[in-house]
């Protein structure tokens, strides 16, 4: 199979979808790999590294897309890439379609077969291809929150860990999944006062056991969220419904009651965000104000640490890439139920019901297409 790796074009997105070791494994299995020139530079991977592993370097994104049977990306296609997609081609990347009707429409109109990293789901409900980027974003959230709590970052001038005789920052983490637990761990490491909120009591019990009382936990409901958010210096939104739009947990009216200079970091922005006033921002212009609070809603947070993120991502995606390349997408999905759940579109058909529900579009299950 011909596997193509174009450069990412989203603002400040320096990750790349394949490393030289991945190229080596694909070539060893009998496949051809085509990489756009300089695609790996942001992740400190040079063209020469790809060539040494067996890849062919192409000069433009158009050449890569035209050549490839299987296109590997990190982020969803944006408008300038839509014309490159075609029927008979397979795209394997993060899609987050519940938050993007234009991208969904473009995929359906092109007829491309698209498989989303974030909806590949194991029998235990875990999301193996989303987990590493959730971990990165979760670990970054307290860092960016701490910066923006500083007065030079636009915040109320609070130090996360406080000092002797002065209160530490109050951090509320909404969601105790991979990103939420990662955020809580880093915030605790910064010596903040941390409250973890989730509706899953088993997860909260696990957090209590891990951190032995060093953080507080509370069951999620509207009353407790309101109390926590009003008292918070930093709120980190880390909720997820696989494939679907994130639930809205913090209203505009609630933000109006927050402390002046408080900060909200929405990790869930890829799936539409969990704050009413959230809208996607970029690393170049990451924040905006609502009432007297500062919102940080960068949709590709891990893109700011591309070296770490690229290797963390490709560690988990490569086995699935090899399955698709070795068997062809249809047989690979038939053989692997977890991978089958990643199928989002196929020749103009939406195959992810949670996306259909979020966007009001007709959909079928992956099994209906595969069978």
Give the location of each predicted region:
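Residue-level detector of alpha-helix initiation sites
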Residues: 76, 136, 177-178
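Glycine/serine-rich phosphate-binding loop and adjoining beta1-alpha1 elements at the start
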Residues: 2, 8, 79-169, 298-300
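Adenosine-phosphate binding glycine-rich loop
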Residues: 118-159, 269, 274-371
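Short glycine-/small-residue-rich Rossmann-like dinucleotide-binding loops
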Residues: 69, 75-76, 95-96, 221, ...
């Amino acid at each position: 199979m011909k596997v193509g790796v174009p450069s990412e074009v989203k603002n400040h997105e320096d990750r790349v979808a394949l490393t030289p070791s991945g190229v080596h494994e694909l070539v060893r299995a009998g496949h051809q790999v085509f990489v756009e020139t300089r695609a790996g530079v942001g992740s400190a991977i040079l063209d020469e590294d790809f060539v040494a592993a067996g890849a062919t370097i192409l000069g433009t994104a158009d050449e890569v897309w035209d050549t490839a049977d299987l296109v590997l990306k990190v982020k969803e296609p944006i408008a300038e890439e839509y014309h490159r997609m075609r029927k008979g081609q397979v795209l394997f990347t993060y899609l987050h379609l519940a938050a993007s009707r234009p991208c969904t429409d473009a995929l359906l109109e092109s007829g491309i077969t698209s498989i989303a990293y974030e909806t590949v789901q194991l029998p235990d409900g875990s999301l193996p291809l989303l987990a590493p980027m959730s971990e990165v974003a979760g670990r970054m959230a307290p860092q960016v929150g701490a910066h923006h709590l500083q007065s030079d970052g636009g915040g109320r001038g609070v130090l996360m860990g406080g000092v002797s005789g002065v209160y530490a920052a109050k951090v509320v983490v909404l969601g105790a999944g991979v990103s939420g637990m990662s955020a809580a761990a880093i915030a605790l490491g910064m010596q903040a006062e941390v409250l973890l909120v989730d509706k899953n009591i088993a997860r909260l019990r696990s957090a209590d056991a891990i951190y032995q009382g060093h953080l507080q936990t509370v069951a999620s409901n509207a009353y407790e969220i309101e109390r926590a958010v009003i008292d918070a210096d930093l709120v980190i939104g880390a909720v997820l419904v696989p494939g679907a739009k994130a639930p809205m947990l913090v209203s505009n009216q609630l933000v109006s009651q927050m402390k002046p200079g408080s900060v909200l970091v929405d990790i869930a922005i890829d799936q539409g965000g969990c704050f009413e006033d959230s809208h996607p921002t970029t690393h170049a212009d990451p924040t905006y104000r609502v009432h007297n609070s500062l919102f940080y809603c960068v949709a590709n947070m891990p893109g700011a640490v591309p070296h770490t993120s690229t290797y963390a991502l490709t560690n988990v995606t490569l086995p699935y890439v090899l399955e698709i390349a070795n068997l062809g997408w249809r047989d690979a999905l038939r053989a692997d139920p977890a991978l089958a759940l990643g199928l989002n579109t196929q020749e103009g058909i939406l195959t992810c019901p949670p996306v259909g529900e979020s966007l009001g579009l007709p959909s079928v299950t992956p099994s209906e297409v595969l069978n």
